[in-house]
């Protein structure tokens, strides 16, 4: 970037940088700084006269002659600093105060201070600074909001695209964003502690795979130069974890980064985090109770309550959760019994219900589309949707009482899928036949049909005990427990379009209408707008 492209503020800060060096002060020192306290700790445990060593960013300055105040922000919060010229410059040379602090330090710069804790006349806990050291110079100004005399906030850093692209700035100037990610860390920590308390083993499985199995999704493709073969970023870790059950482990789990080369919207990112667990000698009924206990425990650990505010809804994660079969759910919300229908009849039913289809969709996909459009969004309180048709679940065991169904559930919360679980298919002959059916769907053009993994079939031929498996979306769980409506709010660095390119999106007329309406409304009105437009989950998310 040339000097001509710099703003007035950036030019001023670079000039200050050079002046610091001329004074013999290194703006980016290498040696450690011996921090021994945090602002929150000082405020929570006030100890007058205690000597402390702090470091952080300058977020505010009030210059008043020989004495001044500054606000410093560290990793735990903010605290007021008091600077007296003669205390930080006890000798004849007053340049550290008169030149460095007053003129050359800007908002956003990092400093280190030693001082003593005290309270001002108005009772604000502060630190009386004795020594000052420059730790890092910021040559771009932070977008700090300002509040005018009427209480109106100006220059707030609120544009979502800017916030997601420059999360490092977002975290500095918007404390609530930092709290969201601290809570995310606590959610994952609580889940891991719960799983470890059950003595299940945390494992790692390959991210680069020769066959991307375990889910119905489009993979990312890459190439291994040394082996001269195509490889795929995993879409799920299911098949590798089940191989470990074959190998003799009774319970394994993994927090996995998975990748799906599909659409992006408020609840989907191409790179996402899942936790998958497989436990031998269990079934999907046991797994429902396990999931209930786990989610209730996490809510109590992180929030101190099982009642969670998600948008306009108060959702209770108190056990037990409601249960309903998929066929009964479709019948409840459409009045149609799909149980006896073949593919032709299902296609006609989709047309009657206004559900979009294409020729590549088989029976299972058609049922999935009906449920997604007409039922899914109605389940606000945690609800297990159980007993899926066999065509929808190629890795799942057939139902013990009805071979047309499978022992599968999905947990719906706030109108979205949160978890998916099976009584796992461990019959290698049946598994091979299911894979072959997926191959036929792929030939019809279904790019979400599962890949055939014959090595996995071979592993089953050595024998896998009865097993229940479950996958839960960590990003979506974090959305729910932090009351965020967008997945981008719970990912530090969500996938974004390149800044240098302008890409025109092709939208339907309905989606264009949503886009135009969204320009006119505030975030708090989104749910009301969605209700008034009567759009399905899929059309709303894309729009």
State where each predicted segment sits.
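Class II aminoacyl-tRNA synthetase catalytic cores and aaRS-like
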Residues: 1-504, 526
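Short alpha-helical segments that sit at the start of domains
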Residues: 503-517
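Short capping segments at the starts of secondary-structure elements
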Residues: 519-525
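A short acidic, leucine-rich amphipathic alpha-helix
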Residues: 528-531
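Short amphipathic alpha-helical interaction segments
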Residues: 535-543
């Amino acid at each position: 970037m040339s000097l001509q492209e710099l703003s007035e503020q950036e030019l001023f800060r670079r000039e200050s940088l050079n002046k610091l060096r001329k004074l013999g002060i290194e703006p980016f020192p290498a040696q450690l700084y011996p921090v021994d306290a945090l602002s929150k700790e000082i405020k929570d445990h006030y100890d007058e006269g205690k000597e402390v060593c702090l470091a952080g960013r300058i977020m505010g300055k009030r210059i008043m002659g020989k004495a001044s105040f500054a606000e410093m922000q560290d990793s735990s919060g903010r605290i007021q600093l008091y600077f007296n010229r003669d205390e930080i410059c006890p000798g004849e040379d007053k340049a550290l105060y008169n030149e460095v602090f007053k003129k050359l330090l800007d908002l956003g710069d990092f400093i280190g201070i030693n001082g003593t804790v005290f309270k001002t006349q108005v009772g604000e806990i502060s630190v009386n600074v004795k020594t000052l050291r420059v730790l890092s110079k910021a040559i771009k100004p932070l977008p700090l909001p300002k509040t005018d005399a009427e209480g109106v906030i100006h220059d707030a850093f609120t544009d979502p695209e800017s916030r997601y692209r420059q999360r490092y700035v977002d975290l500095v100037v918007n404390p609530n964003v930092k709290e969201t990610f601290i809570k995310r860390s606590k959610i994952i920590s609580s889940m891991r502690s719960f799983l470890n308390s059950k003595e299940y083993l945390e494992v790692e499985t390959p991210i680069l795979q020769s066959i991307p199995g375990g889910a119905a999704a489009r993979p990312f493709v890459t190439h291994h130069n040394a082996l001269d073969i195509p490889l795929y970023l995993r879409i799920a870790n299911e098949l590798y974890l089940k191989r470990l059950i074959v190998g003799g482990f009774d319970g394994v789990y993994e927090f996995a980064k998975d990748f799906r080369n599909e659409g992006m919207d408020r609840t989907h990112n191409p790179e996402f985090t899942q936790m998958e667990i497989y436990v031998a000698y269990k079934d999907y009924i046991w797994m429902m109770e396990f999931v209930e206990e786990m989610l209730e425990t996490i809510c109590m650990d992180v929030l101190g309550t099982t009642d969670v505010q998600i948008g306009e809804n108060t959702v209770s994660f108190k056990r037990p959760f409601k249960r309903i079969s998929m066929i009964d759910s479709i019948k409840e919300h459409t009045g149609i019994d799909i149980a006896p229908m073949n593919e032709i009849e299902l296609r006609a039913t989709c047309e009657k219900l206004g559900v979009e289809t294409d020729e590549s969709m088989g029976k299972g996909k058609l049922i999935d589309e009906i449920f997604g459009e007409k039922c899914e969004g109605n389940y606000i309180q945690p609800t297990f949707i159980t007993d899926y048709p066999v065509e929808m679940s190629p890795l799942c065991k057939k139902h013990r009482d009805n071979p047309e169904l499978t022992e599968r559930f999905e947990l719906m919360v706030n109108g979205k899928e949160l978890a998916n679980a099976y009584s796992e298919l461990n019959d290698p002959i049946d598994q091979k036949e299911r894979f072959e059916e997926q191959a036929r769907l792929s030939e019809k053009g279904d790019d979400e049909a599962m890949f055939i993994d014959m090595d996995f079939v071979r592993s089953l031929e050595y024998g896998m005990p009865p097993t229940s498996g479950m996958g839960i979306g960590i990003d979506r769980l974090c959305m729910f427990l932090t009351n965020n409506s967008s997945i981008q709010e719970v990912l530090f660095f969500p996938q974004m379009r390149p800044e240098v390119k302008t890409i025109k999106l092709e939208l339907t007329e309905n989606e264009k209408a949503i886009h135009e309406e969204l320009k006119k409304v505030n975030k708090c009105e989104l749910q009301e707008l969605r209700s008034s437009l009567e759009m399905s989950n899929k059309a709303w998310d894309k729009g």
